[in-house]
Amino acid sequence: MSLDKQLKDIIDSDLHRYGYSSEGQMGFMTKRECYGYRYSKVLRKCKWYREHDKKILFLFERVKLRMLSEKLGFQITYSTQIGRGLYLGHMGSIVVNWKAVLGDNVNLA
């Protein structure tokens, strides 16, 4: 399995928690309004690029992660270990320690 395929599978498992089987099912406005999924997607990409030495992509995603963190009130670092199926249920003040280990299908709401 290629690295990009693995990243896509992880992101799709997060998307499944929001009730969609693929991004194609989501309309444009749904993508804009689904803040938890937007944040988790950028978080996953940031972590992935950091671990696989893709520095330019990592820096780009890190800036996006920082902007979304400030906008939404989420403080979850890319170094936090998170299993598949992350669900962020609401906007505003969600803080996770960088040493935390979260399993599969975790709800943070």
Predicted regions located by residue number:
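Terminal amphipathic alpha-helical/low-complexity segments used for targeting or macromolecular assembly
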Residues: 1-72
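Beta-solenoid/beta-rich acyl/carboxylate-transfer cores
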Residues: 75-87, 91-107
